[in-house]
Amino acid sequence: MTVLPRRDFLKTSVAAMASVYGLPASSASAANAAAQPASKHASKPALIHATDLFRPHADPDDHFDLATVFSLVFQDRIDLLAVMIDHPPAGHAGDPDVLAVAQMNRIAGSSVPVITGSPERLDPAEAAKPGNRAGASGAFALLETLRRSPRPAAISIVGSCRDVALAGRLDPDLFAAKCAGVYLNAGSGTPDKSLAARLEYNVGLDPVSYAAIFDLPCPLYWLPCFEVAPGGEVRFAVAAHGTYYRFLQQDVLPLLSTRLQNYFAFLFKQGESDRAAQSEADALRPNWLRYLDGPREEALLERQGRQFRNMWSTAGFLHAAGLGVSADGAVAPLASVASPAYTFDPVRVRCGADGVTEWSPDPRSRDRFIFRVRDVARYPAAMTAALTTLLRALP
C-alpha cells in the first residue's frame, strides 16, 4: 500500500476519481464561518455520526454518545443522515454494533442507516481499484450521503479519522460545498508540541488520517479528548483544553426510561464490564428487540451503577445542533447561554503526519476552532447534568 507524503495528501487528482465513479466536482467554495455551529445552514441541521461503536464494546462511552445523538433526533433538533461505524482495529474482538443502532432507531422512531468503514488506509488511486472498492465503500457512501443531503451536513468523528479523511481526499470540492463542519473528538489540546507527542487513543488509530482532517476545506471544531494524553505518570484529568469528564452511572441510569435502561444493560451484558456475571450464551444472544422491550435486569444495572463512566464527546453534538450548556448544566440555544460551560475559540493549528499538533490563538481565524472549558471545577457536573437532560428526553 502506498502512503502519500503529507504534503500531497489533498493534492491527488479528483478528476480521475470523478471519471471512474461519476463523482461530480463541485465548484462551490466554503463560506467564511465564525465560531457558530453547523446549524447556521438550516433550522434543523444535518449530521453524520462517525464512531468506533462495537459489540462487544471497546468503551461504553460510544453507546452513550449514540443515545445522545438519537435524543437530538427524537427532539427534532437534528437530521441524522447516517451512522458510520469504524472497521474494528486489529486485535479487537468486536464488530460494528448495528444492534445498538437498531435499538436506538426503535426508541427514537427513526430509520437512520449504517455505514461501515475501511479496514485499512488507502490513497484515492488505490480506492479506485476494483479490488479495493468494497474496502473503501464507507468513504464513497459518506460522499454520496453528503451529495444527496439537501443542505450542508456536519460530521462528528469520535473514533478513527480514516474514512472521513479518505472521503475528503476523494472529493475536496464536495466537502467545501456540502460539509458544514467537522467535529473532531481526538487528540491532545496542549499547545506544547513535546507534550502532544504522546498520542491520544483516537489519534493513534491512524495518525496520517487524523492529520489530514486539519487540512479539509471546511470548518473544523477540534475537541481534544485531553489536554495531555494519559500515560506514565499522567492520569485522566479535567483540563481547559480537553473534553474529558466522568460520572457515577448510578447517578444517571435510574433516571432513564425502562427501554433506555435496557439499551444500556444489553451492551453491558455483552461486554467485558459484566462478563463475569454472564453465561456465554447470554453474552452472545442477539435478542436486541425482545431485550429492549423486556423487563429491567435490576441486579445488572445495580452492578453497573457502581462504576464510573468516562465521557468526551457530548459538547460537540450539542454545538452541532445549535445548543450550548451553561455553567450550571442547563441546555439551551447557543445565543441564550450567558455563562457557558465551554466555548470554541479561534486558532491557527497544524498537524504533522505523525499526529502531533501545534496551535496558537488566532482571533482572525474563521474556520478553525478549539474547545475550551471555561470553569474546570464546574465542568464535570455541568456536562453530567446536560447529558442526563438529553438522555431523559428519550422514551
Which residues does each predicted region cover?
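N-terminal export signals
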Residues: 2-3, 8-31
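Structural signal for hydrophobic packing residues in well-ordered secondary-structure cores
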Residues: 73, 105-109, 146, 217, ...
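Conformational coupling and interaction surfaces
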Residues: 44, 66-79, 201-204, 220-395
